[in-house]
From Swiss-Prot:
Pfam families cross-referenced by the UniProt entry: Ribosomal_L6 (PF00347)
Species this chain originates from: Mycolicibacterium smegmatis (strain ATCC 700084 / mc(2)155)
Purpose: This protein binds to the 23S rRNA, and is important in its secondary structure. It is located near the subunit interface in the base of the L7/L12 stalk, and near the tRNA binding site of the peptidyltransferase center.
Gene Ontology CC: cytosolic large ribosomal subunit
Keyword line: Ribonucleoprotein, Ribosomal protein, RNA-binding, rRNA-binding
Top-level taxon in the UniProt lineage: Bacteria
SUPFAM superfamilies: Ribosomal protein L6
Protein family: Belongs to the universal ribosomal protein uL6 family.
InterPro entries xrefs: Ribosomal_uL6-like, Ribosomal_uL6-like_a/b-dom_sf, Ribosomal_uL6_a/b-dom, Ribosomal_uL6_bac-type, Ribosomal_uL6_CS
Subunit composition and interactions: Part of the 50S ribosomal subunit.
Name of the protein in question: Large ribosomal subunit protein uL6
Name of the gene encoding the protein in the UniProt record: rplF
Ranges that cross the membrane: none
Annotated GO MF terms: rRNA binding; structural constituent of ribosome
Length: 179
């Protein structure tokens, strides 16, 4: 039995869960999220209101989807109650970010500013010209947008310049030695 998959997902008060076959809908104070659960996995409610994820057999595919489905459901519940935030920072001379309406405009050493538009359900916040955050209720969407932004100017291994996640340690390389 999957150690993660066998644990029930607790549903806090104020969160409404609707199970319709393989489709799961979670509605909370921050919004609504839906998930299509993969075929061999079944989802049901326990007496105490928690969500229970079960698998029909011990095939490799069922075992791998068991823990995944449970974690995705737990992420939905956390998303509609607390939400997700990814803090990011920019290092480099002249590198900065500013909020333009709901979008982010970056100056990252290119000959032009780079504009990142906020997709539906994602909000940006700028704390300083070098620190900003990406927030939303969908963990996958927050992570994807954060990765797209980081890819604009990856951290340089020699000088450490670029966009990185807050607290991320960049592995530095030693430059060429002069004679």
């Amino acid at each position: 039995m999957s150690r993660i998959g066998k644990q029930p997902v607790p549903v806090p008060s104020g969160v409404d869960v609707t199970i319709n076959g393989q489709n799961l809908s979670v509605k909370g104070p921050k919004g609504t999220l839906t998930l299509d659960v993969a075929e061999p996995i079944s989802v049901s409610r326990a007496e105490d209101g928690a969500i229970v994820v079960t698998r029909p057999d011990d095939e490799r595919r069922s075992r791998s989807l068991h823990g995944l489905s449970r974690t995705l459901i737990a992420n939905l519940v956390t998303g509609v109650t607390e939400g997700y935030t990814q803090k990011m920072e920019i290092f480099g001379v002249g590198y900065r970010v500013q909020l333009k309406g709901q979008n982010l405009e970056f100056a990252l050493g290119y000959s032009h500013p780079v504009l990142i538009e906020a997709p539906e359900g994602i909000t940006f916040a700028v704390e300083s010209p070098t620190k900003f955050s990406v927030s939303g209720i969908d963990k996958q969407k927050v992570g994807q947008i954060s990765a797209v932004i980081r890819r604009l100017r990856r951290p340089d291994p020699y000088k450490g310049k670029g966009v990185r996640y807050e607290g991320e340690q960049i592995r530095r390389k030693v430059g060429k030695t002069g004679k």
